[in-house]
Amino acid sequence: MRLNILIGGKAGQGINKISEIVSSVLVEYGYFTFNYRDYPSLIRGGHNFNVLSVSDKRIGSIESKLDVIIAMDENTLKIHKKDLKSKGVVIGLNGFQDLGRNLNVAQAGALIKVLGIDKKILIDEIENQFHNKESNAAAEKGYDSQKEKFNLKKLDNKISIKTGTQAVAQG
């Protein structure tokens, strides 16, 4: 099993945070993750994206065809929709426009539901990272807005998350 998820939007919208939240939840669930961060624009508001690959086996790269696109703006769909698989899922802005800085948390919640992961693991991760009720509410709103598509089962793999820098430093 392998899934590729693109998270795209304007610089400064919390794209990396979505990837961090979802990666933490997936690792807790026993899945291997690989995150590619694209930085074409360092100017706030320019287009940025991450591709998060998920697998039940070790992985060391991303794939070009996408199973899910999280679009934090319309430009993301214009640029990346051509790479979406025919049965792929798009998580857009519908119903989330009023969330402001919690848009990314809501979209992370929506993705966790699409993946078929238990809401409690999501809420525990949100509480661990943000410590506020608004973020919890946004995550729940996102989760409740979607239907399950992939039904990931909890695995017994014991995995930790490391950045490339951490891995190099540890040898």
Predicted segments with their positions:
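Active-site cofactor/cluster-binding pocket
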Residues: M1-G171
